[in-house]
Amino acid sequence: EHHGFSKTAAKTPWLKRRYLPYPVLAREIVKSFDALPLKDVPRKVRVGVVGEILVKYQPDANNHVVDVIESQDCEAVVPGIMEFMTTRPYITDWNEKYLGTGGNKTLYALMRWSLDRYNAPIKAAIATSHGKFKQDDPMPELVEKAAEVTSIGVQAGEGWLLTAEILELIEQGCPNVICAQPFACLPNHVTGRGMFGKIRRLHPDANIVSIDYDPGASQANQLNRIKLMI
């Protein structure tokens, strides 16, 4: 962004209004950021960040990995949290077939419908930006992506969704991925580091590195591994 720190976004008169309908609010937010002037330069190298939910989003837990990526003149790409919060309604068929724990099908169908309705204004607003902003893949597509590499039955921790997010980033033109995880988070080592081999066979251009974030971990080693990957 040309000015830095999205200064133009602060000059939005709609912020002063007490209430806006949700679809209107979504459109105004996208419109404000879409209006930001951009530098006419080639796109920077993109580096994705996935991993354990706390380490992925909390800067103090991941030693400010987004700042590290941007300090290397790269673009950080962090998938949203909505998918993590809404996985259950989309895997009921698998759970019913293999575990017998599919639950109330009508209830989960209603939940899926409600989530789709909730996301619809956001998707419609982003669609008006002419491709400047990335649309997240729908949850059913993420389930299909994960099933190519691992089992949907891997549901501990971030489970199959972690694998799906890596595949989503690679297929959207971000083959460089940092998988951030606590040292002792075994489920994430299985669905993260454990899937690297198969992902690389499917996508030879994948450039994935696993970084352990722990109070006893060396920050110098973390920085070196990130820089070597880039």
Task: Give each language-model segment a name.
Residues 1-230:
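An N-terminal assembly and electron-transfer interface module characteristic of large anaerobic redox
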